[in-house]
Amino acid sequence: MKNLIITLGITGCGKSSWLKDKHPVVETDDLRIELLGNIDDITQEGFIFKTASKRLAELFDSYDTVYFGATMVDSNHRISFLQSVKDMCVYSFVIDVVVFPSDPKVSIARIKKDLKDGILRANSLQYIDQQYKQF
């Protein structure tokens, strides 16, 4: 049985850090860089998530476990995204959700520190409160 492991938590809660030693991983931030040239470009989320669905489905050809990194805090988008992966995939798979504790103050501090230190990450400070309410 195949296994899709997805992250769930607000921006800055540690999802990408947790995924660093996992393989293979599809992350929306990485796709924004690759496809749009800008980690902060959220103007084409449909395109980004459709590409993510396709890549995840394709990775199951070679791997039994595949990881997906994104906030996924909005349940309406989460369900439709997971359905799109299922629709594209020829394999049956189980979905495991890794829920990250979310503290807006901690996330804000982490993001500010990363940006100050020149770490490539989305400047998503303006979305934390909205994500936390959805979480």
Where are these regions (language model features)?
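Amphipathic alpha-helical transducer elements in NTP-driven molecular machines
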Residues: 45-53, 75, 101, 125-132
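Short glycine-rich, basic-tinged beta-strand/loop micro-motifs
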Residues: 66-68, 113
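Conserved substrate/cofactor phosphate-moiety recognition/catalytic segment
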Residues: 16-66, 73
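Compositionally biased low-complexity segments enriched in polar/charged residues
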Residues: 4, 47, 60-61, 88-89, ...
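Conserved GTP-binding G-domain of TRAFAC-class P-loop NTPases and closely related GTPase folds
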Residues: 1-8, 13, 17, 23-24, ...
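ATP-dependent NMP and nucleoside kinases share a basic, alpha-helical "lid"
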Residues: 34, 73-119
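Surface-exposed alpha-helical segments enriched in charged/polar residues
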Residues: 54-57, 61, 79, 83-86, ...
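Short His-Asn-centered micro-motif
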Residues: 8-9, 68-71
